[in-house]
Amino acid sequence: MHGTIYVKTMGIKYTTISKTGRRSNNEDCFNVLKMPEHNRFMGIVCDGMGGHSFGEVASEAVCNAISKYWQDNTDTPDSDQKVVMACKKACNAINQKSYDLSHAEMGTTMVMVSIEGDKATIAHVGDSRCYLLRQSEGLLYQTEDHVRIDFGWEIVSRCFFSYRPEVAVPDIRQFTIQKGDRILLCSDGLYKSMAPDILQARMLDDKPLEDILDVFDFLCQKQGDDNYTAILIEIE
């Protein structure tokens, strides 16, 4: 999926990728909302937690719930409170899915960006990431993974998890964006398949967005072992 929309005086180009990789099924889910008539654009990536059953159910439930809340509230300015309310809706959605499946445990991460004019609101729960890069300055912002190390294992410390709303606490940041800025939303299957300097250098390449994701796709196929999903955005 790719395209270009216009928000106020800015154009927003984007392209996406989501692949199973070496796993048996794809537990990632993503969505893009294009709302130029409301001066808005929104992208979201969710990564179902493979250590639990129904990861793909969890990621789809949260992705759909937050997308629906955002679309139903286009007249409400972006804010921390708006993100928190969307996350509450997502918690309700994952709880309902768990109930429907005999109280099955399920969980997912989430990362999103909402662009309103020249303002970008970035929120995440878990270890899916957002990168914001500017041609003249390089990396402006990278989300901080919600993980801890237990006995040498990485454990996701915040996520959307059935009947555990207290761990679905988002980090939220707002930025003023400029023409030329690039934003990447991705699951850990993508960024763990390449060195950080390679990822950032490729994001700033003077190439079409589709060509950049083609490089990421190649590296994930060659070096990755997980599902991988990304939304790459450029402000024109």
Model feature map: region roles:
Residues 1-236:
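PP2C/PPM-type serine/threonine phosphatase catalytic domain
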